[in-house]
């Protein structure tokens, strides 16, 4: 009991001390700390990346060559010293994972310490598509493949719609930039359904994004990759054709595609 009273007394003293501290001690200014003033400013630009391994910069060397980091480093949204950046993406994430886990974190309220992004980039769906590829490789009955693929991509469309709806409601001032899926010729050569499957997927992305008349924008990564060489790791000698992540060059192309749409819709 005495120990509990001591702890309570310490908490009261701490609260009084913190409450009495001058504002300059609670939030250092650039002149006092030597730290760039822009990131301490109330109006600092806030950029959040959501998605899967591609948004995470997986297998980029170094990882900061991933498209998300390139957007930050090239000051696509604002100068670096006036930009707060949060990469919430996770390798392996499906559209369901983004909807259930990343979106709620993106919507944490400012009063609770939330990020309150002004710009959001989203790259998700590759792992949804890989589930179809796995099904094709393991299911002996080809007549079930198209229904399964249709089901997966249709559910992806529902998830994407819910992701964008929740972001629009929870962050009404934020602008959201959504990538579609680039072609993977090495897989398409081995799995004839892969090309039509990606085309259907991109149609769904286009339709869902089109349902939001403001602050949601399509980034046509598919078009940006067309005709390019060595943009995907599976194209490189000695690498499995089923390696679907971009090369550093591919990430650069993605960053350029995003930057063009962002610049046009600031």
What residue ranges belong to the model's regions?
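A structural motif corresponding to the C-terminal end of an alpha-helix
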Residues: 78-79, 162-175, 204-219
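Catalytic His-Asp segment of secreted/periplasmic serine-dependent ester chemistry enzymes
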Residues: 181-266
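Oxyanion-hole/transition-state-stabilizing segment in secreted/luminal serine hydrolases
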Residues: 97-154, 183-184
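Bacterial N-terminal signal peptides
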Residues: 11-19
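Structural recognition of the beta-strand scaffold that forms the well-ordered cores
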Residues: 46-51, 55-56, 84-89, 118-123, ...
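Serine-esterase "nucleophile elbow" of acetyl-processing enzymes
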Residues: 27-89
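Short amphipathic alpha-helices and their capping/turn segments at secondary-structure boundaries
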Residues: 33-43, 99-117, 162-173
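Bacterial N-terminal signal peptides that target proteins for export
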Residues: 2-10
